């Protein structure tokens, strides 16, 4: 019997996704839990597993096409298809409705367990599980985000739910991984690009990729919502240059690639603490300002697929070396398409580095709902006046954009001056803790 597999809700609050790459084709024999496709949403690339074993009859959605949750994307000739009818979007939605109408007795029995989970489980965590497993967890009163998956790529199975009910493993050690081959974007472009008749001015057209749509939406929303003001400045970083040179070899001995960026992260965190208005969110509709008592720094990363912003969490608690390692790891994940949505959430302020591309000053766009973004340009040798003499020194270009609804010009410049002071004399960062 043919089993119609529908694009499932992957738990990110996203209702559609672009089919980036199929790993199967008509005629292939597959096993349950084999990866069928990679789907890209606004946040990340996610692997979609098969809920059944069988033979692929037909792939219904081409690579590069956007499918909506619930759409049939592939048909599989599965011997147990009749028993598997509950798997997929439809039944999952029905079970959600049933939950709202009545509470399960099992859930009442597990209430003490659930209350404990609420204090320990990261509710924003991405879960890999089929709809049937999610339903099974709900029926047994288990928060699926507290369960450690033992399946392929950390996928959660019914056996994992049973083990959890019997006092087994929790979410500790659970990992969500996504994979994306560098050639996938080429495949999408090749399939989506259509050549028009040749002439004096030949053109081609292609569908806008999901990632580019997400970036465009975020940029337009930020510029339309927040009145941007950008301050541009520069600072002599000779001592910073020498400090990094002094510790570069020491860092390398322990496997750390030391760059200037971790220094900027620490300087920005210090500025956010001294001028907390920059570490807020401005909600005009609700009439509220959200004050954030944590310091997570987003690092804008340029990739082949577009701009991604992985986040260094609790940057105030980490050393220069630790931040350097984390930035390098996140950058590799970004380039390889392996960032999870969790690694791109929770930033309180962002850094954009145009200097790595040879740029100097620019007007970085705020990563809404944040209220500020620090842009760093290249370090260039320039003439400066020092002790009454003109000398050459390495000078760093800085650009600070902020939301003028929340931050006044003087506050923005004072924050910029504080950052300049720390980068001019990096030993002061030791005094910051």
From Swiss-Prot:
Enzyme Commission no: 2.3.1.12
Biased composition (Basic and acidic residues): 84-103, 117-126
Low complexity: bias regions: 166-188
Presence of keyword Aminoacyl-tRNA synthetase: no
Top EC class of this enzyme: transferase
Catalytic activity line of the entry: N(6)-[(R)-dihydrolipoyl]-L-lysyl-[protein] + acetyl-CoA = N(6)-[(R)-S(8)-acetyldihydrolipoyl]-L-lysyl-[protein] + CoA
Residues annotated as catalytic: 404
Gene Ontology CC annotations of this record: cytoplasm
Chain positions with N6-lipoyllysine modification: 43
Alphabetized UniProt keyword annotations: Acyltransferase, Lipoyl, Transferase
Domain Peripheral subunit-binding (PSBD): start-end pairs: 128-165
Record note on cofactor: Binds 1 lipoyl cofactor covalently.
Residues covered by region (Disordered): 80-134, 164-204
GO MF assignments: dihydrolipoyllysine-residue acetyltransferase activity; lipoic acid binding
Every Lipoyl-binding domain range: 2-77
Keyword Hydrolase included in the entry's annotation: no
Subunit annotation: Forms a 24-polypeptide structural core with octahedral symmetry.
PANTHER family attached to this UniProt entry: DIHYDROLIPOAMIDE ACETYLTRANSFERASE COMPONENT OF PYRUVATE DEHYDROGENASE COMPLEX (PTHR43178), LIPOAMIDE ACYLTRANSFERASE COMPONENT OF BRANCHED-CHAIN ALPHA-KETO ACID DEHYDROGENASE COMPLEX, MITOCHONDRIAL (PTHR43178:SF5)
Known role: The pyruvate dehydrogenase complex catalyzes the overall conversion of pyruvate to acetyl-CoA and CO(2). It contains multiple copies of three enzymatic components: pyruvate dehydrogenase (E1), dihydrolipoamide acetyltransferase (E2) and lipoamide dehydrogenase (E3).
Family as reported in the entry's similarity comment: Belongs to the 2-oxoacid dehydrogenase family.
Descriptive protein name: Dihydrolipoyllysine-residue acetyltransferase component of pyruvate dehydrogenase complex
Organism of this sequence: Staphylococcus epidermidis (strain ATCC 12228 / FDA PCI 1200)
